Amino acid sequence: MPRVKRGVTAKARHKKILKLAKGYRGRRKNVYRIAKQAVMKAGQYAYRDRRQRKRQFRTLWIARINAAARELGMTYSTFMNGIRKAGISLDRKILADLAVFDKVAFEKITNQVKAGLAN
């Protein structure tokens, strides 16, 4: 069995990592050992932040709904309780969008919620 020289595969492996490290600063972009660590850490951050993004958006939506509801004389918790009692099936993303971009529609929903809470 002939001896296998690893030059081609090593070059390909290095090239793949250095391509992923493109745009990094300093030696992270052109020294294989450092670039490999940087790419691995970037992957860890990406994995973590894909999960955190969902939490952060939910927090943002809640803050927006709360601010808009308070302008109309309600707190977030009473507003969401009223949404459920009124049978309105809009999620937080849509409610936050309405609160920011269509205040008239959000006000109509709030009036329905107040009517639902009164019953």
Swiss-Prot record:
State which gene encodes it: rplT
This protein is called Large ribosomal subunit protein bL20
Residues in coiled coil: none
Please report which protein family the annotation says this sequence is part of.
Answer: Belongs to the bacterial ribosomal protein bL20 family.
GO terms of biological process kind: ribosomal large subunit assembly; translation
Role this protein plays: Binds directly to 23S ribosomal RNA and is necessary for the in vitro assembly process of the 50S ribosomal subunit. It is not involved in the protein synthesizing functions of that subunit.
InterPro entries, per the entry: Ribosomal_bL20, RIBOSOMAL_L20_CS, Ribosomal_protein_bL20_C
Keyword Heme on entry: no
The signal peptide, as residue positions, is none
Q: In the UniProt record, which is one GO cellular component term?
A: ribosome
Example GO molecular function:
rRNA binding
